[in-house]
């Protein structure tokens, strides 16, 4: 299969090496088409800041296949994640600490209350049955830093997600506050929050979305309002 590579301000040497193994696609519509045309039965995402244990893919694949043989509504799996605090210095990464991120999530299907804690299940800890993703993913903006959580809420309204209580994914947090080495969503937290809200509002306005999805989104809005009112009341006292 002929590999197609489009270069956009990325190191030429890196791209040359990468092109021998993978296709790099930047256009969003091309990504959607590539997902549809792929012969793979599964789909996963890797944030460029994060990392996996060597057995991540094989372990999640085997557990998901086993679970699906019993529970047909389970079309995705997420493992426990460790938070890695680190500093980037030139070409070196210095790890300061590693600690549990979401180890409170029990084995089994995810409860709906997980949606109240944004990124409690990180993008890089999930593996999906590809066919279950196709109809959902096209409603979301892949190029947005806030892509995953609105997509995950939408996905959870239509599918069950199984939790594997094994820490096989690593959620990296750069302590640098500069744009070269820091985490985009941390440095641009306000923009990230705005894009999440816009995506959630768009889903709430869509007449095509399920009633369950609208209930989930309404609960998020009500929960946010409750915390804001409580904060104001505490300030008044």
What is the meaning of each model-derived region?
Residues 1-189:
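Nucleotide-sugar donor-binding/catalytic module of glycosyltransferases
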Residues 7, 92, 131, 203, ...:
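N-terminal cationic leader/targeting segments used for protein routing and processing
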Residues 55, 88, 198-201, 224, ...:
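General helical secondary-structure elements
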Residues 171-174, 181-212:
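Catalytic core of nucleotide-sugar-dependent glycosyltransferases
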Residues 210, 214-237:
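Heptad-repeat coiled-coil amphipathic alpha-helices that mediate oligomerization/assembly
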